């Protein structure tokens, strides 16, 4: 699947959830569906098998999820099954979570450093970049000695490279 298709489905579901003030519920329900499908190999094989009829998948979804998730998530799952997009469920869920987090003012950041950062350093980076982007950042720290020093911060599709390795490479190219 192209991620553009998944994003369109996620955006459509997000708009419905937003209009009904059910973003949190839909996110939790969709997460429960994803967890159930991904956590059970037999269920996953059935739901993702291209030669199993949509009617059979819809009946199975009805038995497993109708009384356990809200109307929006359940109906959305049926739309995916009808359109042959159930294989894209995980990607759609990830896109939905990203949209929900953006609406809440959250962003995920991956901070790569040569040595482990202290909690204080992580909080300071989260605060400074959070203020710049007007977001509350959730930091994930990664240690990569190859960057030599400094930090590389990835937030969404933005990359802030303050690593010593990149600075040395840039300097060497200019020399």
Curated annotation (Swiss-Prot):
Gene Ontology cellular component annotations, sorted alphabetically: plasma membrane; proton-transporting ATP synthase complex
Localization: Cell membrane
Main localization (coarse): membrane
InterPro entries the record matches: ATP_synth_OSCP/delta_N_sf, ATPase_OSCP/d_CS, ATPase_OSCP/dsu
SS bond list: none
GO molecular function: proton-transporting ATP synthase activity, rotational mechanism
Membrane topology: Peripheral membrane protein
PROSITE patterns, per the entry: ATPASE_DELTA
Family annotation (SUPFAM superfamilies): N-terminal domain of the delta subunit of the F1F0-ATP synthase
Keyword line: ATP synthesis, Cell membrane, CF(1), Hydrogen ion transport, Ion transport, Membrane, Transport
Pfam families, sorted: OSCP
Subunit details: F-type ATPases have 2 components, F(1) - the catalytic core - and F(0) - the membrane proton channel. F(1) has five subunits: alpha(3), beta(3), gamma(1), delta(1), epsilon(1). F(0) has three main subunits: a(1), b(2) and c(10-14). The alpha and beta chains form an alternating ring which encloses part of the gamma chain. F(1) is attached to F(0) by a central stalk formed by the gamma and epsilon chains, while a peripheral stalk is formed by the delta and b chains.
Family according to the record: Belongs to the ATPase delta chain family.
Free-text function comment from the UniProt entry: F(1)F(0) ATP synthase produces ATP from ADP in the presence of a proton or sodium gradient. F-type ATPases consist of two structural domains, F(1) containing the extramembraneous catalytic core and F(0) containing the membrane proton channel, linked together by a central stalk and a peripheral stalk. During catalysis, ATP synthesis in the catalytic domain of F(1) is coupled via a rotary mechanism of the central stalk subunits to proton translocation.
Protein's name according to its UniProt entry: ATP synthase subunit delta
Species classification: Bacteria, Bacillati, Bacillota, Bacilli, Bacillales
This protein's encoding gene: atpH
